Amino acid sequence: MLIRGEIMKLLRNISQVFLCCSIASFANAETVKIAIGHQSMCTDTYTAGIVVKELKLLEKYLPTEGKYKDIDFEVSWSDYSSGGPITNQMMANKLNFGVMGDYPLIVNGAKFQATDSLRTKYIAGTGYNLKGSGNAIVVPVASDIYGIDQLKGKDVSVPVGSAAWGMLLKAMQDNNISSSEYGLKNQSPAVGAANIAAGKIDAHGDFCPWSEIMEFRGTGRKIFDGSETNVPYLHGVVVREDFLDEYPEVAVAFVQAVYEAGDWIREDPVRAVDLMEKWTGVEKEVLYIYFSKGGHLTLDPTIKSEWVDALKLNHGVLVTEKSIPPLDFNEWITEDYLKAAYKGLGKDYDAEKSIMNDPAVSNKGLPMEIWHSREGISTYSSMSKFLSAVSEFRATGAKLNSTYVYDKETGLKLFGKTAFFVSTDDGFSTFLRKPDADAFASKTAGMVMDLEGALEVSEKLMKVSSL
């Protein structure tokens, strides 16, 4: 009995030692909260937002060595309808990272620099369109408005503080339309799109992919594309400086996750848009117009000197139109985390930074596409083959998810059903805007029509050629 008692006492002592060690280990473990604000209804944020979130790419790259050995990371994502609320939450120290468009980025940096001690850093991009496509102004599909000059005396809504808001201000400035000559309404993307569908607003300006959502659903029609401003359309990542100072390796990990997200989309755009539709609710056919080969967005985290120039120009637009604090771009923008991330991935940052994609050049000669509901996407090297295929599919009663053509002026990928077709002796050309189509038709003695008209002309030509 004595021996048994001694053994029990020894076991109790050992248990107490292990318990104390476990408590001490738990007490030494630090939990670092990583709070990210993103926008699941803004396509140009996806490589730093929904894709990173759903594929858990940040967790893949988070540091685990050195001072991070005993750290537990708690990653949280908050979804917002535009960039402005993200900045507000960052200022309240409820978010460390923010993903937003060019004008909201500028407001973010300027607001933080206007404080005594708080700062953010612009550490990476997500994607771009060189000429500015992504933002657009849309009217109800039955509207008789076809140009921005027709917006004088009209009511125009936009999410104030968004990238589209900045685009709208710039577009009005460029067309000599003063703020007193139109009514500006602050409406969220969802409200603006609903009002366009109901014909309750004359026009609505919004960021990607809302104009294409309205086009795809048959409720809206573009009258102005952001590419007409000829200013790059950008999104990027800002981080609170106090977080960066304490956990710089986390920012590097975030950039590496952004890079992999871009690779994942490029590897298989159809797979990507199918999953992103499930994650966001945005139709895959709409997402395809952004993320496919020849799509509106070039996924690229690098910060090019041209982007800095564009952001400075955008800041000037806001200074002219609205009261906005100064912004020291040299203090705000840093490539340090990008360079460290690229080095860790074995990539050449300077080489990728030097690459610039212009859709007007790179999209020349790309094939037209038909997305069949069962057979997937087929490509066509000529407009005649494309139109014939559409007619043949329809004759079988097949459901076509979407068709895609390219704007002759900008190289932008368009929905076939919303493009303006011009029929000439040399065949068909397609345009985003009716004024461009009218001008081309005037030069070439052509006729402007929609897809249905083009199909009729194509069928007549085929019958004649078969005689």
What spans do the regions from the language model cover?
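Conserved C-terminal helix/tail region of periplasmic/extracytoplasmic solute-binding proteins
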Residues: L318-M356
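Bacterial N-terminal signal peptides that target proteins for export
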Residues: I3-V17
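Intrinsically disordered, low-complexity linkers and terminal regions
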Residues: G236, G346-T379, M383-L467
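A bilobed periplasmic-binding-protein/Venus flytrap-type ligand-binding module shared by bacterial periplasmic
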Residues: V52, G134-I145, Y233-E249, V422-T424
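Sec/Tat signal peptide C-region and signal peptidase I cleavage site
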Residues: E6-I7, S25-A29
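Secondary-structure end/capping motifs
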Residues: T43, D245-I324
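Pocket-lining segment of extracytoplasmic ligand-binding domains
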Residues: Q113, E181-K185, P189-K278, S384, ...
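Short, glycine-/small- and polar/acidic-enriched structural segments
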Residues: E30-S178, G183-K185, D202, V231
